[in-house]
Amino acid sequence: MTYLLALDQGTSSSRSIVFDELGHIVAQAQQELPQIYPKPGWVEHDPMEIWRTQLATAREALGKAGLKASDIRALGITNQRETTVVWHRATGQPIHNAIVWQDRRAEATCAQLREQGKEALIQSKTGLLIDAYFSGTKLKWLLDNVPGVRAQAERGELAFGTIDSWLMWQLTGGALHATDVSNASRTMLFNVRTNQWDAELLDLLGIPASLMPQVLPSSAHYGETRPELLGHAIAIGGVAGDQQSALFGQACFKAGMAKNTYGTGCFMLMHTGTQFQTSHNGLLTTSAAQTTAHPEFAMEGSVFVGGAVVQWLRDGLHAIQGSGEVQALAQSVPDSGGVMMVPAFTGLGAPYWKPDARGTITGLTRGTTVAHIARAALESIAYQSAALLQAMSRDAVSSGAAPLAELRVDGGACANDLLMQFQADLLGIPVLRPAVIETTALGAAYLAGLSSGVYRSTDELSGMWRAERTFLPTLGADSAAALMNRWEHAVRQTVLP
């Protein structure tokens, strides 16, 4: 049996998973990652703690699997995207804490770019909207606000990277300063049409080109780990940002295939093939994980409050003691009794982009119970995802592509059968839950397996993908459309006059 190791560095934890060549999990390990909140709206991580926890889980996973590093054919890395690290090339020490993707400190820079009328330029090159979410403005903040850093950067003494770059630098002892196209595409500095750092965008934000890592395909021979770290050198063969890695792990290799990750929020990606498409529905264009030097693209949208609405039921309303109780409570009534919840706790993301929206619960009567509210809360996740998917389908159809035929799902909340069935009903297409739901880590393992010869092609990987359960729609198209109309009416009520 051949084995692959996936390093899955996330926002709240570092994880490592050993897979066999059939895509089965052999062993896994996880360590929590402390969050640092220096000011309201600021979120940081300690880069050395990221490295320490990731290395520790890799060692633990190998130990649990009863394997040595020499038994591992290759290693893949997947990571929280956009989070920004700058370090000294000579020592490998960071100059500051990592600025996490959720951090909003660069909003003033983004406002200036909008005032300068740079939105069309940036979207045409990067596929992104101007937002503090992306790495470029975080990097500018570090250059402008950490004493001495700009001068050091201009002398070529510093390196920038997203978390994948940082881990590869540490794994190789500084021999490798690289990233993959999917992570590069989230910086707002990378031209996704040419697959290169964009000189005009670097100049716009005042970023020296010497800071930037080499960009490689997501499946490639990156280098090897230092032998002393794990007991033997392991080839680094695959790298992708978490959402693109999940798309790959779901075997969504062809245009029109899509996945939705149901976590605290929801992340939906649709593969759009080799043609760059600009969304007319408020979605992002991003690089998909690439196995060759030729660009491949995906359309992306995110729901801010997905599974977090269940946490609110528990912690805010005290309607449930634990998140696992929500399905039974919601199933204790046949429907929501006319109750509609729009959980716009932090505004609404794609496709609405209403930052000033606030959460609402409508349709309450004397007969409304906590079970109706729980059901409406669960259904809100499906409504938001359906609105996002319908926007993606409109973009696909307008560019001459076929609408989506099925949706593949992953993430913690996809275990909720009630939610998945309602999602299929709203969309009118099958919803497929995979046998292996650790699709983010699996994607990294697949990418490493391709470059190291474990797999011959993505066709072989497609043949390995298995659904654990398929949810078929049980509602007619007219009934589903009526429900979506009620949802859109509720969304319009979230912005106060």
From Swiss-Prot:
<feature type="binding site">
    <location>
        <position position="81"/>
    </location>
    <ligand>
        <name>glycerol</name>
    </ligand>
</feature>
<feature type="binding site">
    <location>
        <position position="133"/>
    </location>
    <ligand>
        <name>glycerol</name>
    </ligand>
</feature>
<feature type="binding site">
    <location>
        <position position="243"/>
    </location>
    <ligand>
        <name>glycerol</name>
    </ligand>
</feature>
<feature type="binding site">
    <location>
        <position position="12"/>
    </location>
    <ligand>
        <name>ATP</name>
    </ligand>
</feature>
<dbReference type="Pfam" id="PF02782">
    <property type="entry name" value="FGGY_C"/>
</dbReference>
<dbReference type="Pfam" id="PF00370">
    <property type="entry name" value="FGGY_N"/>
</dbReference>
<feature type="binding site">
    <location>
        <position position="133"/>
    </location>
    <ligand>
        <name>sn-glycerol 3-phosphate</name>
    </ligand>
</feature>
<feature type="binding site">
    <location>
        <position position="82"/>
    </location>
    <ligand>
        <name>glycerol</name>
    </ligand>
</feature>
<dbReference type="InterPro" id="IPR018483">
    <property type="entry name" value="Carb_kinase_FGGY_CS"/>
</dbReference>
<feature type="binding site">
    <location>
        <position position="11"/>
    </location>
    <ligand>
        <name>ATP</name>
    </ligand>
</feature>
<feature type="binding site">
    <location>
        <position position="13"/>
    </location>
    <ligand>
        <name>ATP</name>
    </ligand>
</feature>
<dbReference type="GO" id="GO:0019563">
    <property type="term" value="P:glycerol catabolic process"/>
</dbReference>
<feature type="binding site">
    <location>
        <position position="11"/>
    </location>
    <ligand>
        <name>ADP</name>
    </ligand>
</feature>
<dbReference type="GO" id="GO:0006072">
    <property type="term" value="P:glycerol-3-phosphate metabolic process"/>
</dbReference>
<dbReference type="InterPro" id="IPR005999">
    <property type="entry name" value="Glycerol_kin"/>
</dbReference>
<feature type="binding site">
    <location>
        <position position="242"/>
    </location>
    <ligand>
        <name>sn-glycerol 3-phosphate</name>
    </ligand>
</feature>
<dbReference type="GO" id="GO:0005524">
    <property type="term" value="F:ATP binding"/>
</dbReference>
<dbReference type="GO" id="GO:0006071">
    <property type="term" value="P:glycerol metabolic process"/>
</dbReference>
<feature type="binding site">
    <location>
        <position position="15"/>
    </location>
    <ligand>
        <name>ADP</name>
    </ligand>
</feature>
<keyword id="KW-0067">ATP-binding</keyword>
<feature type="binding site">
    <location>
        <position position="412"/>
    </location>
    <ligand>
        <name>ADP</name>
    </ligand>
</feature>
<dbReference type="InterPro" id="IPR018485">
    <property type="entry name" value="FGGY_C"/>
</dbReference>
<feature type="binding site">
    <location>
        <position position="264"/>
    </location>
    <ligand>
        <name>ADP</name>
    </ligand>
</feature>
<comment type="function">
    <text>Key enzyme in the regulation of glycerol uptake and metabolism. Catalyzes the phosphorylation of glycerol to yield sn-glycerol 3-phosphate.</text>
</comment>
<feature type="binding site">
    <location>
        <position position="307"/>
    </location>
    <ligand>
        <name>ATP</name>
    </ligand>
</feature>
<feature type="binding site">
    <location>
        <position position="307"/>
    </location>
    <ligand>
        <name>ADP</name>
    </ligand>
</feature>
<keyword id="KW-0547">Nucleotide-binding</keyword>
<feature type="binding site">
    <location>
        <position position="81"/>
    </location>
    <ligand>
        <name>sn-glycerol 3-phosphate</name>
    </ligand>
</feature>
<feature type="binding site">
    <location>
        <position position="264"/>
    </location>
    <ligand>
        <name>ATP</name>
    </ligand>
</feature>
<feature type="binding site">
    <location>
        <position position="311"/>
    </location>
    <ligand>
        <name>ATP</name>
    </ligand>
</feature>
<feature type="binding site">
    <location>
        <position position="416"/>
    </location>
    <ligand>
        <name>ADP</name>
    </ligand>
</feature>
<feature type="binding site">
    <location>
        <position position="242"/>
    </location>
    <ligand>
        <name>glycerol</name>
    </ligand>
</feature>
<protein>
    <recommendedName>
        <fullName>Glycerol kinase</fullName>
        <ecNumber>2.7.1.30</ecNumber>
    </recommendedName>
</protein>
<dbReference type="InterPro" id="IPR018484">
    <property type="entry name" value="FGGY_N"/>
</dbReference>
<keyword id="KW-0808">Transferase</keyword>
<comment type="similarity">
    <text>Belongs to the FGGY kinase family.</text>
</comment>
<dbReference type="GO" id="GO:0005829">
    <property type="term" value="C:cytosol"/>
</dbReference>
<feature type="binding site">
    <location>
        <position position="11"/>
    </location>
    <ligand>
        <name>sn-glycerol 3-phosphate</name>
    </ligand>
</feature>
<dbReference type="InterPro" id="IPR043129">
    <property type="entry name" value="ATPase_NBD"/>
</dbReference>
<dbReference type="InterPro" id="IPR000577">
    <property type="entry name" value="Carb_kinase_FGGY"/>
</dbReference>
<keyword id="KW-0418">Kinase</keyword>
<comment type="pathway">
    <text>Polyol metabolism; glycerol degradation via glycerol kinase pathway; sn-glycerol 3-phosphate from glycerol: step 1/1.</text>
</comment>
